[in-house]
């Protein structure tokens, strides 16, 4: 299991809007591997500034390939992406 942490470029809202439909299609196509995810925000009611996605991938390379195919990554929305091994410990699982 891996956590994918993405941070947007400043002022990337127009790019998010441009690639949103393709990004949502990408998420749907890959839903068997995506355990959960959603936007990161600086304030609860603020704009998206990134994303956190937890995926069921066997290797870091598989998780990196998955995010590399995301239209938000390909379209220049994300300034940085980190892929880290993740272990769920709470709640018990």
Please give the residue ranges for each predicted region.
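Conserved, structured core segments of small domains
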Residues: 1-93
């Amino acid at each position: 299991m891996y956590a994918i942490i993405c941070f947007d470029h400043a002022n990337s809202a127009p790019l998010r809007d441009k690639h949103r439909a393709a990004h949502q299609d990408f998420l749907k196509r890959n839903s068997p591997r995506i355990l959960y995810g959603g936007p990161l925000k600086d304030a609860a009611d603020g704009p998206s500034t990134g994303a956190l996605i937890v995926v069921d991938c066997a290797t870091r390379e598989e998780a990196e390939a998955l995010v590399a195919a995301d239209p938000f990554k390909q379209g220049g929305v994300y300034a940085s992406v980190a892929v880290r091994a993740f272990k769920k410990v709470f709640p018990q699982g």
